[in-house]
Amino acid sequence: MGNCNACVRPDSKESKPSSKPKKPNRDRKLNPFAGDFTRSPAPIRVLKDVIPMSNQTQISDKYILGRELGRGEFGITYLCTDRETHEALACKSISKRKLRTAVDIEDVRREVAIMSTLPEHPNVVKLKASYEDNENVHLVMELCEGGELFDRIVARGHYTERAAAAVARTIAEVVMMCHSNGVMHRDLKPENFLFANKKENSPLKAIDFGLSVFFKPGDKFTEIVGSPYYMAPEVLKRDYGPGVDVWSAGVIIYILLCGVPPFWAETEQGVALAILRGVLDFKRDPWPQISESAKSLVKQMLDPDPTKRLTAQQVLAHPWIQNAKKAPNVPLGDIVRSRLKQFSMMNRFKKKVLRVIAEHLSIQEVEVIKNMFSLMDDDKDGKITYPELKAGLQKVGSQLGEPEIKMLMEVADVDGNGFLDYGEFVAVIIHLQKIENDELFKLAFMFFDKDGSTYIELDELREALADELGEPDASVLSDIMREVDTDKDGRINYDEFVTMMKAGTDWRKASRQYSRERFKSLSINLMKDGSLHLHDALTGQTVPV
């Protein structure tokens, strides 16, 4: 993706005042979500031994790096060929310059450790080798070139409950294998399952262990991670274990069977509230035609009480999974394939928006928050106590009362040590200033609004969605336009664009740090409005503080 090459021009005839994004001022606007929250961006020191056990030889001695396959926050994935065997592989080259915090480095180390620890499995992408030089960490792994799960389903002309059961079994086996080896994936979603090749009988492979963690029985975790649609209620409550993977797998199976997520809303907080309520819709098509056995499994995988939810082993023992080959072979209908196609294409559009946003995350804008942290940290020990937070908020003109400040302190202090480190402080600032990163939304909107009309029109949407898979078909474009274009004028204005991006977006695609801080802010909001306590009353559980 390149730089924004179009500017928004006023159109007095067409544009509405509320829908027209103003040209951003990069010098004034605050953006706390970019890059390095703990040190100045220059000079950049060279990290050594990010992966201590990596190969000491150069990657070029064994492999030839070819064309680019994809691009993420920290690096680029290339086609990679073994010099001796000529085997085609993938190499994820992670830029060490972009590993700006200790958390970033630990994420990479843990991902490599987990992929190295997991035994070889036909449905998990295999890490072949890791290399490290002055500029990059290189992870050489199996190549998956068969496309994403939903794209394959949509491409087939015939889609049945039996086919969905076969995919569900594979996903459950992956979860079972991970859990039996002490690994919690924490980010199961359709995009993280790819087909190895384009053959009809290609194995499905789980990828992306970047948010995975090792666990022991009884361990509890508090960090809010994952993707909004697939997040278990106990993740939002910051008290969870491996049952979150079963929940996420249950969400995927629900989508496989009907084409839409079970918990949906127009905002991130709305999605979270739907998850906490846990009400499943089994009434609209095609659910009346789906077997009771399938519905039974989904209900038990999406039980909001993790102590009552099925384990991965119990999922595999469920009759619907055990008898997957005997599941009804009646087509689920064009409506499911159409919904899956739209869901997949909408995700692709959001990913392109996130790519644009990622390219505009500016390190320099973080200085304002760094200065605020320094101002409040009276004794300069790198942490902020409750008295310092209270006094500091008064210094910057906050009108919050003592009860609200105490609640902010309790929720933002994720590790419970009684003070806020820099990362926890950023979450407080996001919440207080209600920063939804409108500046970055405006930049992204301008990128897709090629003619500067202050609208994204059908041709511009088509261009945005065209990729290596070719032109999107007209019906999918119409469906996306119909969903996003709420005022039904045949085009997407800025407000409609922002609403789309605030519904279930995986912000980790733009920035892991931004994603983490958004979820902390979401937790603060849910705690503040009593939503988590409502969920406690329904399930009999409590939220740790």
Curated annotation (Swiss-Prot):
<dbReference type="InterPro" id="IPR000719">
    <property type="entry name" value="Prot_kinase_dom"/>
</dbReference>
<keyword id="KW-0808">Transferase</keyword>
<feature type="binding site">
    <location>
        <position position="383"/>
    </location>
    <ligand>
        <name>Ca(2+) 1</name>
    </ligand>
</feature>
<feature type="active site" description="Proton acceptor">
    <location>
        <position position="187"/>
    </location>
</feature>
<comment type="similarity">
    <text>Belongs to the protein kinase superfamily. Ser/Thr protein kinase family. CDPK subfamily.</text>
</comment>
<keyword id="KW-0547">Nucleotide-binding</keyword>
<feature type="binding site">
    <location>
        <position position="460"/>
    </location>
    <ligand>
        <name>Ca(2+) 3</name>
    </ligand>
</feature>
<dbReference type="GO" id="GO:0004674">
    <property type="term" value="F:protein serine/threonine kinase activity"/>
</dbReference>
<feature type="binding site">
    <location>
        <position position="92"/>
    </location>
    <ligand>
        <name>ATP</name>
    </ligand>
</feature>
<dbReference type="InterPro" id="IPR002048">
    <property type="entry name" value="EF_hand_dom"/>
</dbReference>
<feature type="binding site">
    <location>
        <position position="487"/>
    </location>
    <ligand>
        <name>Ca(2+) 4</name>
    </ligand>
</feature>
<feature type="domain" description="EF-hand 3">
    <location>
        <begin position="436"/>
        <end position="471"/>
    </location>
</feature>
<feature type="binding site">
    <location>
        <position position="496"/>
    </location>
    <ligand>
        <name>Ca(2+) 4</name>
    </ligand>
</feature>
<keyword id="KW-0449">Lipoprotein</keyword>
<feature type="binding site">
    <location>
        <position position="424"/>
    </location>
    <ligand>
        <name>Ca(2+) 2</name>
    </ligand>
</feature>
<dbReference type="GO" id="GO:0005509">
    <property type="term" value="F:calcium ion binding"/>
</dbReference>
<comment type="function">
    <text>May play a role in signal transduction pathways that involve calcium as a second messenger. May be a positive regulator controlling stress signal transduction.</text>
</comment>
<dbReference type="GO" id="GO:0009738">
    <property type="term" value="P:abscisic acid-activated signaling pathway"/>
</dbReference>
<feature type="binding site">
    <location>
        <position position="381"/>
    </location>
    <ligand>
        <name>Ca(2+) 1</name>
    </ligand>
</feature>
<feature type="binding site">
    <location>
        <position position="453"/>
    </location>
    <ligand>
        <name>Ca(2+) 3</name>
    </ligand>
</feature>
<dbReference type="GO" id="GO:0016020">
    <property type="term" value="C:membrane"/>
</dbReference>
<feature type="binding site">
    <location>
        <position position="455"/>
    </location>
    <ligand>
        <name>Ca(2+) 3</name>
    </ligand>
</feature>
<feature type="domain" description="EF-hand 1">
    <location>
        <begin position="364"/>
        <end position="399"/>
    </location>
</feature>
<keyword id="KW-0106">Calcium</keyword>
<feature type="domain" description="Protein kinase">
    <location>
        <begin position="63"/>
        <end position="321"/>
    </location>
</feature>
<feature type="binding site">
    <location>
        <position position="377"/>
    </location>
    <ligand>
        <name>Ca(2+) 1</name>
    </ligand>
</feature>
<feature type="region of interest" description="Autoinhibitory domain">
    <location>
        <begin position="327"/>
        <end position="357"/>
    </location>
</feature>
<feature type="modified residue" description="Phosphoserine">
    <location>
        <position position="227"/>
    </location>
</feature>
<keyword id="KW-0472">Membrane</keyword>
<keyword id="KW-0677">Repeat</keyword>
<feature type="domain" description="EF-hand 4">
    <location>
        <begin position="472"/>
        <end position="507"/>
    </location>
</feature>
<keyword id="KW-0723">Serine/threonine-protein kinase</keyword>
<dbReference type="GO" id="GO:0004672">
    <property type="term" value="F:protein kinase activity"/>
</dbReference>
<feature type="binding site">
    <location>
        <begin position="69"/>
        <end position="77"/>
    </location>
    <ligand>
        <name>ATP</name>
    </ligand>
</feature>
<keyword id="KW-0479">Metal-binding</keyword>
<feature type="binding site">
    <location>
        <position position="449"/>
    </location>
    <ligand>
        <name>Ca(2+) 3</name>
    </ligand>
</feature>
<dbReference type="InterPro" id="IPR050205">
    <property type="entry name" value="CDPK_Ser/Thr_kinases"/>
</dbReference>
<dbReference type="InterPro" id="IPR008271">
    <property type="entry name" value="Ser/Thr_kinase_AS"/>
</dbReference>
<feature type="binding site">
    <location>
        <position position="417"/>
    </location>
    <ligand>
        <name>Ca(2+) 2</name>
    </ligand>
</feature>
<keyword id="KW-0418">Kinase</keyword>
<feature type="binding site">
    <location>
        <position position="451"/>
    </location>
    <ligand>
        <name>Ca(2+) 3</name>
    </ligand>
</feature>
<dbReference type="Pfam" id="PF00069">
    <property type="entry name" value="Pkinase"/>
</dbReference>
